[in-house]
């Protein structure tokens, strides 16, 4: 019997994530990539990349994410809701998780894994998300990685409101005019994201136990994650940082593909 492979594709508001594993659940390929609102070519390029490396693999495919439903119909593959996909990954790989904090391009989520699953989500405003961080980085003439690098050497955290960028400028500009160090401004932006996420989503409900940090911003921006850890006063043993934390929905989609129709990479392009 030929080997089968399982592919999960997560289409978010700003990025696409692709994850492929074999029958032993070993990852053979994964990629996190911005799509710049041009989703189909981005996915096609990722599938082409897999095919160039591994040939025309037989695959079972499931899509997920905020932009995945219509595209799944176009490609004639199954779709699974993102919360279901992420929950599957958590239950499979980090069952000890009590709460997951996830930041995406234009949404933020806190999921409580208790006797009943409870997810709280901000999907209506970009404040406190990856898009907000990008906007602030652009305002300061850098990128998210640049913010992160400078934030490593901060000394003071200033109050900044993580709301719409046009309002945040009124907090940042006085700091700049008064000569505040860039390192301090950058960490203050990250702290604003933390405050917005915790106050806006948890709404007083305790975030405790083993905490997983998921999504691209928390995977790639070490100082943003560190700001969450400081604010929640977490010990090292309470922090869960999976190796594929930026791909969790795509991994969950792949895990859901067991019973789907088998196709090939070339048929998806």
Residue ranges and their predicted role:
Residues 46-59, 197-209:
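Phosphate/pyrophosphate-binding loops at sites that engage ATP/ADP/AMP, CoA/4′-phosphopantetheine
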């Amino acid at each position: 019997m030929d080997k089968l492979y399982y592919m999960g594709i997560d289409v978010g508001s700003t990025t696409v994530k692709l994850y492929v594993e074999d029958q032993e659940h070993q990852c053979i390929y994964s990629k996190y990539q911005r799509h710049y609102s041009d989703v189909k070519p981005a996915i096609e390029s990722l599938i082409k990349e897999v095919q160039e490396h591994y040939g025309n693999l037989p695959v079972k495919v499931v899509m997920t994410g905020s932009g995945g439903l219509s595209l799944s119909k176009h490609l004639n593959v199954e779709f699974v809701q993102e919360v279901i996909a992420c929950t599957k990954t958590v239950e499979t790989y980090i069952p000890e998780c009590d709460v997951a904090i996830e930041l995406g391009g234009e949404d933020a989520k806190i999921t409580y894994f208790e006797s009943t699953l409870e997810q709280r989500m901000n999907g209506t405003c970009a404040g406190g998300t990856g898009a907000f961080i990008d906007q602030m980085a652009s305002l300061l003439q850098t990128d998210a990685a640049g913010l992160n690098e400078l934030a490593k050497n901060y000394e003071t955290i200033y109050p900044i409101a993580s709301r719409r960028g046009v309002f945040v400028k009124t907090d940042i500009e006085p700091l700049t005019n008064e000569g505040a160090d860039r390192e301090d401004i950058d960490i203050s932006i990250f702290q604003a994201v933390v405050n917005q996420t915790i106050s806006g989503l948890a709404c007083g409900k305790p975030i405790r136990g083993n905490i997983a940090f998921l999504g691209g911003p928390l995977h790639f921006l070490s100082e943003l994650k560190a700001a969450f850890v400081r604010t929640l006063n977490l010990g090292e043993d309470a922090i869960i940082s999976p190796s594929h934390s930026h791909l969790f929905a795509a991994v969950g989609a792949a895990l859901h593909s067991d019973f789907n129709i088998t196709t090939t990479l070339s048929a998806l392009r």
